[in-house]
Regions:
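Membrane-proximal intracellular helices of multi-pass ion channels
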Residues: 1-340
Length: 340
């Protein structure tokens, strides 16, 4: 029950039942809205086949919100079809926010609370998420606008669509894989960082989570400005949260480093490609540049294990650190060391 409470973002065991009800209801509502929004576009794509359209609408709606990242026929996002792609993008984006954020937004909307009264977790998650999405969108347009492998003879619309997909999907959703091997090495590295960060805490996304990344940045800002407290939105972040963020980030960074080097040794691939596939596996991004294949089963097993650790690792580390500990019987004197 304590692990469930931690995963759902509540601190009271008595709230688990109520929060679970809201979580299930929210999932059904978002998936239902996505189903309705997808039907017209898929109906046109399937040339009026109602039965197949109903099946695909249901499948895409459930899969998008849960960030599963695969399709029944390998068709991806029906590339350049905005009527199908936008609902999937929106649903996948909601799935990466996390249950505490969705719950806080729903309660704030019901009680008509202004944004300034949102919880600190909601503010950090939304702010960091939107910054990452905008940065990814801008990066892709600037770096890949003249990429002839991707946009040979295409106009502005395909470029904008691919930029939107690159801004939302790599963090945990996957889907259309066909264009990824054609991007530049700089974009691969950038997307590797995005996939390593992942989505919101207690969400369907992977990675170290955006709040962890935000706390690390806030800690750096406090260190550079000589402040003892780590503050955000006129609130002080607890020291335990900072320790958890540092521990999760360090452990996951070590994992990505070791796995990337192992892939380089096994498959003789470049550092860029090894890093990309490793971060994609760890962050549950669903993308690949073809580092592992049937000819190298060891690499496939390593990536599969990385996916498993990426799904459970950050949560396990956070829970192990945040659980109550007995006070130490002895507290040693402080002594300065040289760092940096």
């Amino acid at each position: 029950r304590m692990l469930t409470a931690n995963e759902l973002g509540t601190t009271k065991l008595g709230e688990i039942k109520g929060v679970l009800t809201v979580v299930i209801t929210t999932a059904f509502v978002i998936e239902g809205i996505t189903f309705v929004a997808l039907f017209p576009g898929l109906y046109k794509v399937n040339h009026g086949n109602v039965r197949h359209t109903l099946w695909e609408s249901l499948f895409f709606a459930v899969m998008a919100y849960n960030n599963a990242g695969f399709t029944p026929d390998g068709a991806g996002l029906h590339v350049n079809n905005w009527a199908v792609g936008l609902p999937i993008l929106a649903s996948a984006f909601c799935g990466t926010l996390g249950f505490p954020v969705l719950l806080n937004l729903m309660r704030s909307w019901r009680m008509r609370r202004p944004p300034k009264r949102w919880s600190l977790h909601t503010k950090l998650t939304l702010t960091t998420t939107f910054c990452i999405v905008i940065a990814s969108f801008t990066w892709f347009l600037l770096m890949e606008w003249n990429n002839k492998l991707l946009f040979a003879g295409d106009g502005i619309e395909p470029r904008l669509w691919h930029a939107m997909v690159a801004a939302v999907m790599p963090r945990s959703s996957g889907f259309d894989l066909s264009w990824m091997p054609g991007v530049s090495d700089a974009t691969k590295v950038f997307l590797s960082i995005v996939m390593f960060i992942g989505g919101g805490s207690t969400s369907t996304a992977g990675g170290i989570r955006v709040t962890t990344f935000a706390v690390i940045l806030l800690t750096c800002r406090a260190a550079f400005t000589g402040r003892h407290d780590i503050n955000a939105f006129h609130r002080r972040i607890h020291t335990q949260a900072v320790m958890t963020a540092v521990a999760v980030s360090t452990a996951c960074l070590m994992l990505v480093t070791v796995v990337s080097m192992a892939l380089m040794i096994i498959t003789d691939c470049s550092l860029c490609d090894a890093l990309f596939d490793t971060c994609s596996a760890f962050g549950l991004g669903g993308y690949s540049v073809g580092v592992a294949s049937e000819s190298s089963p060891t690499a496939l097993y390593i990536l599969a294990a990385t996916m498993f650790i990426g799904r459970l690792g950050p949560l396990t580390i956070a829970y192990a650190i945040s659980r109550p500990h007995n006070l130490e019987a002895v507290r040693y004197p402080t002594e300065q060391i040289v760092v940096g």
